[in-house]
Amino acid sequence: MCSSDLEITLIQKDKVEVKFIKKIKQANNPTKIELAICLVKKTPMEIILQKSTELGVSKIIPIVSERTEVKDLNYERARKIVIEATEQSNQLNPPEISEVKKLKDFLKNLDSSTKLLFADVNSQTILKNDNIKKGEALSILIGPEGDFSPAERESILTVPDVKSFTISKNILRSDTAVITAISLVNFVYFNS
């Protein structure tokens, strides 16, 4: 669905003809995909904000874990980046950027109707079509540089209906992991 400029070319009692002049904006991705990402340094975080917006996430949740070095987010700069990326990718609405959350609080308050997809460096499981259902709300969780601690991993893997999956045989930088994970989830979702 998109917004368009229209010109009415004919009005009669039983019909109206319109001419499409130009498409204005593409409606956002119909999937509700959230990105829960552990905070990283400024430049990679800006890339994460930009690329996740371009790839259609509806919400970005900055996470602080035991091994997260950065503890806060410049919200003014973050909003500017997602607004620019929204315009560049011809979408209508920028993603919501939530307040920074501790990992344990994020896991505790995760909506029961949202499926948690854990991009896990230790997983050998490939995300498949039967792991995601059309219309299902999804939250992709990506860890910090140095990965989650063993206790955090255990907490994540005990979330009901969590799906742990691999995104690469290599260890990826956070910004590369975000692009890869969102692209993979979008691909699987739209082909399910």
Model-derived features with residue positions:
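Structured adenosyl-cofactor binding patch, chiefly the S-adenosyl-L-methionine
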Residues: 150-192
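RNA substrate-binding interface of SAM-dependent RNA methyltransferases
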Residues: 23-115
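A generic structural motif
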Residues: 13-20
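Active-site/ligand-binding-proximal alpha/beta "capping" segment
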Residues: 110-154, 161-166
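Fold-independent oxyanion-binding glycine-rich loops
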Residues: 21, 39, 100, 119-122, ...
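Short, small-residue-biased leader/transition segments that mark boundaries at the very start
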Residues: 1-3
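Generic structural signal for helix capping and beta-alpha/helix-loop junctions
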Residues: 69-70, 126, 174
